[in-house]
Amino acid sequence: MLDRQTQIEMLVDHFKRPRHKGLLEGADAVMPGGNPGCGDLVTMHVKADPDGRVEAVSFEGEGCTISQAAASILADRINRTHPTLDEVMDFPYERMIDMLGKDVVGFRERCATLALGTLKMAAKRIQVHRRLREAGRSDQEIRDLERALMDSRNEPGLVFGEAAEEQRGVGGAER
C-alpha cells in the first residue's frame, strides 16, 4: 500500500497528465455519468471483443482532481488487465477507493467512484445490447427500452446516460 504523500502525488499526476483520455474509435458503449452535487462529469468509452473481454477503455470528463484522476487510474488499469465485462461489473467500489487512498479520498467517495460506476453502466449496456440483438430486437427498440430504464435506475447522488448529459453546465463550479 502506498503512503499518503505518494497517493496524493499519483492523483495529481493522473489529473495533470491523464492516461487514456479522449474518444475511443469503434466503442461499443459511450456512457456519460455525473455527480450533481459537485458538477463532476465523466464519459466512459468501452470496446469489448465478441467474448465479452474489454479490449480498450478511454474517458472524457471535467471536474475535481479526484474524479478525473480516478477516471485516468481506472482506465489505465482496465487497459492493462483487459477484464471481462462481468469482472468489471463485480469490481468493488471499496477497491477503487483503496486504490486511490481511503484517507486521501476522505468524504469524496462519490467523486472517487464516479468513473467506476459509469464504467459499470457502460459494461451493462454492452451486455444488454448484445442480448437484445441476439433476441432479434432492432436498434430503435433497444434505444427506446434503454431510455426508459435509464430514467428509472439512476443511483442516488449519481446520474448516468441522458440525465448526465443534461447536467452539463448545471450545478458545478468551474474547475
Put a short name on every predicted segment.
Residues 13, 17-56:
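Structured beta-strand/loop patches that form or line metal/cofactor-binding pockets in enzymes
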Residues 66-71, 111-114:
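Catalytic-loop motifs flanking and including active-site residues across diverse enzymes
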Residues 38, 61-69:
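Short, thiol/selenol-centered motifs that function as redox-active sites or metal-ligating centers
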Residues 47-49, 60, 79:
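Solvent-exposed residues in well-ordered beta-strands and their adjoining turns
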Residues 69, 82-85:
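Flexible, solvent-exposed short loops/turns enriched in glycine
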Residues 49-53, 64, 93:
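Short connector loops/turns at beta-strand edges and beta->alpha or beta->beta junctions
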Residues 1-25, 30, 76, 84-175:
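C-terminal binding/interaction regions
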Residues 70-78:
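Short, small-residue alpha-helix embedded
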